[in-house]
Amino acid sequence: GSKLWFNCNPDSSEHWFFKEWIDENSEKTAEKNRLHLHFTMDDNFSLSDEVKQRYDRMYSGVFYQRYIQGLWVLAEGLVYGAVFDKSRHIVKNYTPSNQAFYYISIDYGTLNPCSMGLWALEHGKAVRIKEYYYDGRRKNIQKTDEEYYSELEKLADGYNIQHVIVDPSASSFITTIKRHNKFRVRKANNSVIDGIRNTMTLIENDRIFICECCKDIIREFSLYRWDEKSI
């Protein structure tokens, strides 16, 4: 008879493929005449130790369990709880050098909070040195694009901004920024999973730091939880 071969990276333990083909406790799995082989990078003899170490550093948290250890695990609990260490990643009295490049990231929200961060990049590290945060839902007053643009200019005052990086879904706000012709706009990668994975890796490798004055992003890092139904 015919045979099926599958080769895949693990995902959530709630994934249909895991439940139907891999989970030893699943009735659907028990019905199949199948062989499950679990392997990791160490089983690939074509990879050098240097390459394996590089891949090993690329992931952390649940992504390390999935992509390096080959485990089908559920993303649960705090997103950055395992990697964000306040004693290590929060800095005091940080003064960027003359070689620093400056960027502003914007998580634009109408119903959700609007968060803007001024970042200093140097020596392969990014430090959030100032921020603007506004929660229209909590204050019961929504701001216009022009009002948010005014806050952007205040945040950028005194700095040579390379790019303003904005959520691409904030099309009206991007139009407002471009109309003023002061900042160069770069649209952010809107993939939630890629963004979380990259941020976790940068934090784990001590390449992202937060100044203690940026209390809102520090609070968000401490509260941000996985949506177990979607991840």
Regions found by a protein language model. Give the residues of each.
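ASCE P-loop NTPase helicase motor core
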Residues: 1-58
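A short alpha/beta connector and helix-capping loop motif
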Residues: 2-9, 114-124
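Short, conserved catalytic or adaptor-binding loops enriched in Gly and charged residues
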Residues: 23-32, 86, 91-95, 199-203
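Hydrophobic residues at beta-strand termini and immediately following loops
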Residues: 37-39, 68, 188
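ATPase catalytic-site recognition across NTP-hydrolyzing enzymes
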Residues: 44-106
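Gly/Thr-rich phosphate-binding beta-strand-loop-beta motif of the actin/hexokinase/Hsp70
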Residues: 97-121
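Mg2+-dependent endonuclease catalytic cores in nucleic-acid-processing enzymes, primarily RNase H-like
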Residues: 122-231
